[in-house]
């Protein structure tokens, strides 16, 4: 019974790790498009159509 419980816990942990990797992969396009995530108060940068992790930042062209 304990072995079954430990296997279940391991399965839950692995599922959370893979979902975390998928969540972070959608934020990579900013770097792939040649940009960097900066705060919204930054002036003088052209905004790229990519996502950043923080909702208070946008992707700026370097």
Swiss-Prot record:
- The signal sequence is 1-20
Compartments (UniProt record): Secreted
A Gene Ontology cellular-component term = extracellular region
Task: Look up the domain of life of the source.
Answer: Eukaryota
Q: What is its main location?
A: secreted
| Keywords from the UniProt entry | Antibiotic, Antimicrobial, Defensin, Disulfide bond, Secreted, Signal
Q: Kindly state a single biological-process term from the GO annotations of this entry.
A: defense response to bacterium
Keyword match S-adenosyl-L-methionine: no
Instruction: State whether keyword Signal applies.
Output: yes
**Disulphide bridges:** 30-59, 37-52, 45-60
Q: What does this protein do?
A: Has antibacterial activity.
Q: Which family does it belong to?
A: Belongs to the beta-defensin family.
- Name of this chain's protein: Beta-defensin 33
- Write down the species: Mus musculus
């Amino acid at each position: 019974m304990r072995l079954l419980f430990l296997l279940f816990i391991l399965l839950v942990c692995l599922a959370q790790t893979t979902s975390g990797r998928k969540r972070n992969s959608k934020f990579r396009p900013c770097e792939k498009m040649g940009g960097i995530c900066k705060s919204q108060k930054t002036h003088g940068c052209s905004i790229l159509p990519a996502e950043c992790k923080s909702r208070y930042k946008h992707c700026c062209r370097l």
